[in-house]
Swiss-Prot record:
Biological function: Component of the NF-E2 complex essential for regulating erythroid and megakaryocytic maturation and differentiation. Binds to the hypersensitive site 2 (HS2) of the beta-globin control region (LCR). This subunit (NFE2) recognizes the TCAT/C sequence of the AP-1-like core palindrome present in a number of erythroid and megakaryocytic gene promoters. Requires MAFK or other small MAF proteins for binding to the NF-E2 motif. May play a role in all aspects of hemoglobin production from globin and heme synthesis to procurement of iron.
Subunit structure: Homodimer; can bind DNA as a homodimer. Erythroid transcription activator nuclear factor erythroid-derived 2 (NF-E2), composed of a heterodimer of NFE2 and MAFK, possesses transactivation activity on beta-globin. Also forms high affinity heterodimer with MAFG; the interaction promotes erythropoiesis. Interacts (via the PXY motif 1) with ITCH (via the WW 1 domain); the interaction promotes 'Lys63'-linked ubiquitination of NFE2, translocates it to the cytoplasm and inhibits its transactivation activity.
Superkingdom assignment: Eukaryota
Protein known as: Transcription factor NF-E2 45 kDa subunit
Amino acid sequence: MSPCPPQQSRNRVTQLPIPEPGEMELTWQEIMSITELQGLNAPSEPSFEPPAPVPYPGPPPPPSYCPCSIHSEPGFPLPAPPYELPAPTSHVPDPPYSYGSNMTVPVSKPLTLSGLLSDPLPDPLALLDIGLSAGPSKPQEDPESDSGLSLNYSDAESLELEGTEAGRRRSEYVEMYPVEYPYSLMPNSLTHPNYALPPAETPLALEPSSGPVRAKPTARGEAGSRDERRALAMKIPFPTDKIVNLPVDDFNELLARYPLTESQLALVRDIRRRGKNKVAAQNCRKRKLETIVQLERELERLGSERERLLRARGEADRTLEVMRQQLTDLYRDIFQHLRDEAGNSYSPEDYALHQAADGAIFLVPRGTKMEATD
């Protein structure tokens, strides 16, 4: 019997196992159905030379091919140019009958089981030959590669689609990729803090109730209540406020008015001693605060006084400088008006002016005994 169409690769025909004479017809039908499904991979040899796409008006006529044309469907698409063919086969080592779920319909169930056992050897060789010219089809591989990455982000989807067909799995991943990939982890990340908030808030709400700041007033209240409880237990006939706040004479009269045992007297004196110590400590703190306030006021007063004195000193310095300048001008003016017998003016470097006790002014040469004496 003559081989199938010339478009079928020789390696696939030569490497098929030789069937028995009784199963020859079924084997040929199986091969023809596989070649129909491999319409995209059939023209592997013309991919090495620049192809010229020829438009096909319709399916090829029946007499041009052998029994392969009998099983061809009228709506089956024609082979595309070589640069678009290896898109699904460059990185996916699946058999050619798993390219799409719609292409597996013509294969009968008993024939596909035998085809799966007989075709794994020629598929890697054909894929290797076609993968050499799979350069221009890389943009079509992005959806499949990304769909493979999506398995790492959604484990539930991978478990649900594990038993389905390869073509259906690939198409579902492409459809689900833009929706599931960006939002697969966001709901989980938002829900976990919601479950963690209630246990985190409970210790925070309990911390302020047992804080160290509130322990001091409670301790004082406990001390007062403790003295009262001890006084009630010892049956003291007067309240603890009188024990602490009464003066010495009134306190002694109060003790003399009631007959008390030694233990009661010891308790009363202990309560008074601790109460007086507490009052004394409060008064001491009050006096310290008052002293600090007085010192701060005194410092403010001294600071303002210092600023006032500095301003007065500056004004005195300016006034003194003005007086010195005026005295110098007067001294120069006097020497300009003084003349000797010859009518010559006196030089300030050689003569000086001295004032006597009665207010008289004398012109004295510099360096004389009178100047030194004066």
